[in-house]
Amino acid sequence: MGSDRALLVGAAILLAGMMTAPVSGHHGTAASYDGSKQVTITGKVTEFWWHNPHSALFVDVTNEKGERVSWSIEMSSPGVLLRAGWTRRTFVAADAVSVVVNPSRAGTPVGVCLNPCAVTVNGKALSVREP
């Protein structure tokens, strides 16, 4: 199951990179994510990647059919998150989270929560808002 997840995450990242590279520069999230929509993802953390250029949060969600769906959420860089008071230990596996994201235009379980970013982890509200 772990290798299937790694393959899926790798394929999603590769596909997102291939779709956005010709259309926009580094911060061209509009090509991949729908900025006019917001979706609240509520579930359990499976992983949190604390690395440049963007951190990533992985959340397992139970959909309306009772099926598990694994979401990948792109977040700000560790430097931006540090200034907001976050650390590499802000999220750990099995934490209950709620994250407001702009969803993927492709309809896949991928979203972006950059600036501003609102998250609730184990009942505690966190945010990132840079000028």
PLM regions with names:
Residues M75-R83:
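Short, structured beta-strand/loop micro-motifs enriched in basic residues and often containing a Trp
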Residues G43-V45:
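Conserved hydrophobic positions within beta-strands
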Residues S24-V39:
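Short boundary/loop segments of OB/S1/cold-shock single-stranded nucleic-acid-binding domains
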Residues H51-V61:
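Short aromatic-glycine-enriched beta-strand elements
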Residues V9-A21:
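Bacterial N-terminal signal peptides
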Residues M1-A11:
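Bacterial N-terminal signal peptides that target proteins for export
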